[in-house]
Amino acid sequence: MSEGIFTLDAEVRTDLGKGASRRLRHEDKVPAVLYGLGKEAVSLTLSHNKVFQAQEFEAFYSHVLTLNVDGKKVEAVIKDMQRHPFKPRVTHLDFLRVDAKQALQTNVPLHFVNEDKAESIKTHGGHAEHHMVDVEISCLPADLPEFIEVDVTNVELGQTLHLSDIALPEGVTSVELAKGEDHDLAVVTVKTAKGPSVESEEDDAEGEEAAAE
């Protein structure tokens, strides 16, 4: 993975509105907005090809990016990305400015690991049901992780891991947990595999009896 995906060239745009955004997309460009840190929001234009290549990497969504805005470097993270409903196109981006000395809030992906080693799954036939695929965290830009691992090794059948069970990197806190115990959301549950229904078992038995006759 090239570090180049974390640097994007952008231009300030003054031609705003739906019509202007539509024209930009026809020119293979992506409209965007940059905001945050108490500064005025700025409308931007970026190369669609560069954005599309970068967004194929998971780390692009949970990494501090460098925007070269008309020659000036700005540190930011992706806050929102809109896509075309059926075409492989990015239609709009939201960037949030970051300051090295100020904590930021953003979502990072969860990586569920060791499901193949969990006895509840490997031996007892359970399956892991993921209740979320990412988690909102708060941290300084330097502490921003690309992802957070959720270790399923010791999760038993019927057991659920919650946010409070997840080991977060040093300097990283859960935004939801900071709101109180009521926000200790479920992350993953190992559920018992569903067996055949009683009706299907009875049908099988009747079929076997009929075959025997």
From Swiss-Prot:
Keywords: Ribonucleoprotein, Ribosomal protein, RNA-binding, rRNA-binding. NCBIfam families: bL25_bact_ctc, PRK05618.1-2, PRK05618.1-5, PRK05943.1. CDD domains: Ribosomal_L25_TL5_CTC. This is Large ribosomal subunit protein bL25. The gene is rplY. It comes from Pseudoalteromonas atlantica (strain T6c / ATCC BAA-1087). InterPro entries: Rbsml_bL25/Gln-tRNA_synth_N, Ribosomal_bL25/Gln-tRNA_synth, Ribosomal_bL25_b-dom, Ribosomal_bL25_C, Ribosomal_bL25_long, Ribosomal_bL25_short, Ribosomal_L25_dom, Ribosomal_uL5_bac-type. The keyword NADP does not apply. Residues 199-213 have a biased composition (Acidic residues). Gene3D superfamilies: Ribosomal protein L25, beta domain (2.170.120.20), Ribosomal Protein L25, Chain P (2.40.240.10). Pfam families: Ribosomal_L25p, Ribosomal_TL5_C. GO terms for biological process: translation. This is one of the proteins that binds to the 5S RNA in the ribosome where it forms part of the central protuberance. Residues 192-213 are annotated as: Disordered. Disulfide bonds: none annotated. Belongs to the bacterial ribosomal protein bL25 family. CTC subfamily.
